[in-house]
Amino acid sequence: MTTFSAPEPDFAAKRKHLREHALKLRQALPVERREVMTGQLARHLDALMQTLAPRSLGFCWPYRAEPDLRDWVQAWLTGGSGRIAALPVVVERHAPMVFRRWIPGVPMALDRHGIPHPAEGEALVPEVLLVPLNAFDDRGYRLGYGGGYFDRTLAGMQTIAVGV
């Protein structure tokens, strides 16, 4: 039998410090630099999507200076028939998120952080999910905001997660 214990306080404090530091660095980037970097990311995503060829794609509304991929997602939607984009929705705290279909102009609501999401719609599971991150380590492990929403969501979802 395997038992798990809570991470040592040192580890949790280190992660919190790294999260805050990475977020400050990202937010300190000039808007023009972030736009250039988002364009570079979009070109990499173009190549990746040609390889993966998903019919459905989950992405996140930009939050706290994250890459703004909305224009890229709109272009991806128009690049092939039957494509679906989806945004995450926190239905219940400490539970996995659900994804609802997004198209430009769909009625939106704000979550408790002020992040827009589709106000209603059926839940779907995107084939590819663009997951925001603040940093990652040398093994590719993601450092997010610390709420565990994506960890819980990805644990129960069959999708290809791509850190952005």
Each predicted region: which residue ranges?
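Membrane-associated lipid acylation/remodeling enzymes share a hydrophobic transmembrane-juxtamembrane segment
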Residues: 139-164
